[in-house]
Structures are given as C-alpha cells and as structure tokens.
C-alpha cells in the first residue's frame, strides 16, 4: 500500500504521485508520514519536503514556502504558498542566492525589526531552495 501525495501551489501542481514515505517541514519540526498514518492537519514552515516513491529509490526534494498539509486515509494533500522541485533548481544560482541572503541577514540592524523579519524570510527561502537542489544536507 502506498500514499497518494499531492503538492499544490497557487499556480501549479508540483507533485502528484504515489509514495512510500514523506517527510514534511512542519512548524514544530520534521514530520514523517507512512501508510496508515493517523489523520492530521498541520502547518508547514518554509523548508524541504522529502518524498520517496519506493523503498529502494532515492529521496526527491521539494522546496516549500510554507502552507498546510492534510493526511487522511493514506492521502497527503499539501497546499503551499510556493514550491519548487529540487531537480528543477539550478544549484549554482541557489548557492549564490543563499550566500546573498545569509550576508543580508548578517547585515540587518538589530533595531529594525521589520527588516530582520524580511531578511530572515529571504534566508529561509534561499536555504530551502539550496537544500532541495542538493547544496546543503
């Protein structure tokens, strides 16, 4: 028995295929989903989702930009603000964006709370894309 996994962003369906296992970046940490999982509705943080289609296959990585996941009767539906498959991300561009976002985060004034929030969001987004592309473990 397998899971039916769908990742849907406002502009496209990023993933719609069966899977043996899914790991999600929930707001409280990594969340593993296998067949027979209890019903669940959870918020997702910006991060990397990992999907394994079959037991002997490699993990597929998808960068998620926050959203929600619902698990019910071996169906995993993931609604996100944005998503990008790791195999579609240019590693060097993702590395450059990550380095730029990290530098921007380190340069923000500790007194400018709004700038800190924006820089942190940009860093999390760049880190997720870089990780999904295979740049960070």
Curated annotation (Swiss-Prot):
Q: Does the keyword Endoplasmic reticulum apply?
A: no
Any one GO molecular function term: proton-transporting ATP synthase activity, rotational mechanism
Q: Does the keyword Ribonucleoprotein apply?
A: no
Record's Gene Ontology CC terms?
plasma membrane-derived thylakoid membrane; proton-transporting ATP synthase complex
Compartments annotated for it: namely: Cellular thylakoid membrane
Kindly give the membrane topology term recorded for this protein.
Peripheral membrane protein
Q: Which SUPFAM superfamilies match?
A: Epsilon subunit of F1F0-ATP synthase N-terminal domain
Assigned keywords, A-Z = ATP synthesis, CF(1), Hydrogen ion transport, Ion transport, Membrane, Thylakoid, Transport
Q: What is the protein's quaternary organization? A: F-type ATPases have 2 components, CF(1) - the catalytic core - and CF(0) - the membrane proton channel. CF(1) has five subunits: alpha(3), beta(3), gamma(1), delta(1), epsilon(1). CF(0) has three main subunits: a, b and c.
Query: What is the stated purpose of this protein?
Result: Produces ATP from ADP in the presence of a proton gradient across the membrane.
Family label: Belongs to the ATPase epsilon chain family.
Q: What is this protein called?
A: ATP synthase epsilon chain
